């Protein structure tokens, strides 16, 4: 990443910035400077940038009123300048005169994806639609008999020789079609839905409203995240993700922290919060592209009053980059370039920022999204009125009875022939491209207690592994699979397969490939492309498909969990419900929204593990047919041992990974400070003197049992040593004696025995989680030797270990 921050103007406040393919426009008070992008590369000097303001390659536009916002269309063909005197529209590279001035003051301005719709805001929102008309220009020759003071009108039919040339040119204008009134004060941010269905607006009245463009009605009004919003902001510039799935709204407050509230499409929930700024936020903007390396993600840039800029990855709760001290004042606007690798920003103290990123920092771009036409929803909403209007016009213009009908009039009144009605036109029709959409709901999901959201069907899906690459291409009629791998000779080979339904998910290991389709079927292939099983039909549409080693695990939309051993062609257990994971969060007065599954995977031993949005991690143990909570946010604040374990290979331990995920989910939800205040209040009360010590011991015991049930050899050994040292330090002799007795077992069993024996009413195994119990007892005796109070107990078991070794 390259950083470039020149100070363009002294004692001038910038208010907005916008970029196109060739130009960058910045506004300062009553002036707009349109600069070539050549001046903004990091190799340019600050002196050259400042000199360019008065150079011949810079266009300077001056206005009588202060400028609050400027925006290029996405293709860079038009520039809109919002002022208190009106909105000025310019054609690109024709800066001498605005081709249209929209009356009325404007504080914010926003273009739709194709530039057919324009929205401006003050206390109300004005919607304009592009209108393209044809203007005919006729140049007439002057004859020598013509009067110099009067030029007679010459028609084409009467004198064709007098016409020099006739040309037609398109004339673009924008018509006001609707004024939306719903906010109580100024609107500080506007953002169009890339799919053309909605318009989002954020106002200083502490609300964010989503408007449906087909009816201009309120689809959703959101107020809770902005109830404690500070009032010192100049702008509230929000942004819509390139796939239309999320809205990034600024200046939300969660537990006293300034956050970016991510609003999800359709449900309009705001469970995701990006925490990282120390001051109120002015603007947030999505990168215009989605990136798929290492997984699908979108990039967000945000700026606040603290003068720093943060770059976020939506797949992670923490910012991927934070750039401090870029400006002494707050940044008021951020804009990505059309390439997606440059970020421009302006601040109130006259600084212009350029952050230039490398492709390796974001990953590979996904395929270009095919957006629908901006005006499709306007046309659909008005089609009925348009038909009625045409019918009335036909009745009024039809010829009266008894009057002759001219040929020209009959041609005008005759409806145009339908192209789609002829057989030849049907053969000429091109197949429609596959558009990303949600899967068709399975009938069983309509009556289920659980409804898990299914991933969108995408035109292309790429699964890259170290042993091969699987490429999925969905079409309207069928789906194509292409797998590339290396054979035993080291040569690259590939195989293909066609499926009759759209593919939702795909995954694989070195043992098999698995793909899940929209009709609730799972196809399993060998690495060479051989179909290992007939299609496996599950209860509903698959939502999660994970695999590891020989095991394949699937969760369907009705909440049922399936797991198979593909090598042995058998199910590990019958389908299990995930209903216990979706518990409701009860409070005194209401029932809050329940958690959702954020991550899901399966271990090498075939144990499925789910990480929830509230930070809890659950594992299903088939021996007891129950879900176990292996990690939760309660331990994060009260335990002294919260954090990852350092392994010998410098790899993160499985339990450490689960606790890190719990940490991220709690911070993402903004609950960390609440738990910290709760624990501090408890520790100050009388009778809670040993609170931290007891919570730490319970945390270690939970780790021990979790690693034992999940067969985690390294985690069990390390946590057992920590647990033994902790109870020895606290002088808990009964716990130490009980632990040593369990690890020693019956003396009649040889030291290296592997068979399970019956001791009283229970069975005793010489191993646990892949570790020999008596070897673990040796490690405990060595690590607790320095505690004098425990030597009387450990010395007895040391003698018993010597006796068992002689057997």
Curated annotation (Swiss-Prot):
InterPro entries membership: HIR1-like, HIRA-like_C, WD40/YVTN_repeat-like_dom_sf, WD40_repeat_dom_sf, WD40_rpt
Keywords: Chromatin regulator, Cytoplasm, Nucleus, Phosphoprotein, Repeat, Repressor, Transcription, Transcription regulation, WD repeat
Localization (cell): Cytoplasm; Nucleus
GO molecular function ontology, one term from the record: ATP-dependent H3-H4 histone complex chaperone activity
Basic residues: bias regions: 426-435
Stretch list, region Disordered: 144-164, 388-437
Gene Ontology process terms (BP): chromatin remodeling; regulation of DNA-templated transcription; transcription elongation-coupled chromatin remodeling
Keyword Cytoplasm in record: yes
Gene3D superfamilies assigned: YVTN repeat-like/Quinoprotein amine dehydrogenase
Signal peptide: none
Positions of WD repeats: 62-100, 102-140, 182-221, 230-273, 276-322, 326-367, 492-526, 528-574
GO CC annotations on file: chromatin; cytosol; HIR complex; nucleus
Pfam families, sorted: Hira, WD40
Record keyword Repressor present: yes
Self-association state and partner proteins as the record states: Interacts with hip1 and hip3.
Family membership: Belongs to the WD repeat HIR1 family.
PANTHER family according to UniProt: HISTONE TRANSCRIPTION REGULATOR SLM9, MEMBER OF THE HIR1 FAMILY OF WD-REPEAT PROTEINS
Summary of the function given for this chain in its UniProt record: Probably required for replication-independent chromatin assembly. Required for transcriptional silencing in the outer repeat (otr) centromeric repeats and the Tf2 long terminal repeat retrotransposons. May play an indirect role in the regulation of cdc2 and/or wee1 at the G2/M stage of mitosis.
Protein name: Histone transcription regulator slm9
Organism: Schizosaccharomyces pombe (strain 972 / ATCC 24843) (Fission yeast)
Encoding gene per record: slm9
